[in-house]
Amino acid sequence: YKVTISGSVGILASEEITVTDASVEKNFDIEAGKLIGKLTWENGSSFTDFDTDMCQIGLQRQEPYYSSRLANIEQDGSFEVKDILFGTYEVMVCSAYGNADVKVGTITIDSNTKSQNFVISGYAVHMKIVDSEGNPMKYQQFSFINTEDETDRKYFNTDDEGEACLIISKPGTYEAMLRKESYGTVTVTDKNVSVTLRKSEP
């Protein structure tokens, strides 16, 4: 049998046991710690309210069983991720409503408190998307396409204010598309960008 122990923070322990013709007693040692540190942008941009509202820091591992944790990012880029089972994790910056999560490193949690800073490569694109009359495009899935390389595309969903945040890996001009309709372009050069995009007139 596979025995899994779960709590409010997810899977705490999982192990296979064999039951024959007698009672079985099994103890599980659950060790967990926390990660503290600070995120900075490689491009020199500062964190904004938009960044910290729309992005989180996440830890994820696959072995010996899947486990993940998420935590908010503070205005100065600092974070504290609690209740992390001992083990080695990928550290990600996760953009809300998007599929453009960015790996910023790995960390091994093997003590009560671990401290490490991480640098985010790439560029944040903060968008508020409205229709031709200025109404927010709520809960819509857009594609975000590099105009010079159509294979470089990402997808994101807007929130209840028509807003979204993506982290892209390289500068360029990108077009936001809802199905076959254009909602304008964003040009990224050397810093994070915040824009309002409006549906193009036919």
Indicate where each model-derived feature is located.
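Short Pro-Gly-centered beta-turn/loop motif in secreted/extracellular proteins
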Residues: 1-2, 7-9, 75-90, 96-97, ...
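Hydrophobic alpha-helical segments, especially N-terminal targeting/anchoring helices
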Residues: 6, 33, 40-41, 73, ...
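Structured interaction patches on ligand/partner-binding surfaces of diverse proteins
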Residues: 6-26, 95-116, 121, 178-202
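Surface-exposed coil/turn segments at beta-strand junctions on protein surfaces, enriched
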Residues: 19-21, 28-30, 50, 72-74, ...
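A short, amphipathic beta-strand motif
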Residues: 28, 35-42, 118, 125-131, ...
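Exposed beta-strand and adjacent loop surfaces of beta-rich binding modules
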Residues: 34, 52-56, 88-90, 124-126, ...
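Short, ordered, surface-exposed loop/turn motifs in non-cytosolic proteins
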Residues: 41-65, 131-150, 170-171
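Short, acidic Ser/Thr/Gly-rich low-complexity loop/linker segments typical of extracellular
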Residues: 61-80, 148-165
